[in-house]
Amino acid sequence: MNFGETIERVKTRSYIARRANWDDDMFIFAQIPANINEETIPKMQSLPEVVKREITEAGFTSLSYQNQICKFDNGVITYFTPTGNEIFADDWETKSDDTLAK
């Protein structure tokens, strides 16, 4: 499957991977969009205290996580930016609800 086809699958909450080149525990997924309310912001572990203060002092009462493409690699989640080789590769696989597609 090519990269364009797999990105369309990511939009449907599937994950994508290149099993020929990557470890079995590495894959790409889209974070589910979320709205974070005012009560949750101070409790967020993913934001530094100074950032939480800036957000609340600026008067924001909610945060919105949108369109974040993430890479899971051996228990660590980071952002994903594809390389040229990954964009042009035809060996992508997708998985959704335990169904593998190549």
Locations of regions flagged by a protein language model:
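Extended non-catalytic interaction/regulatory regions in multidomain proteins
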Residues: M1-F72
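Short, compact, well-ordered microdomains
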Residues: S62-K102
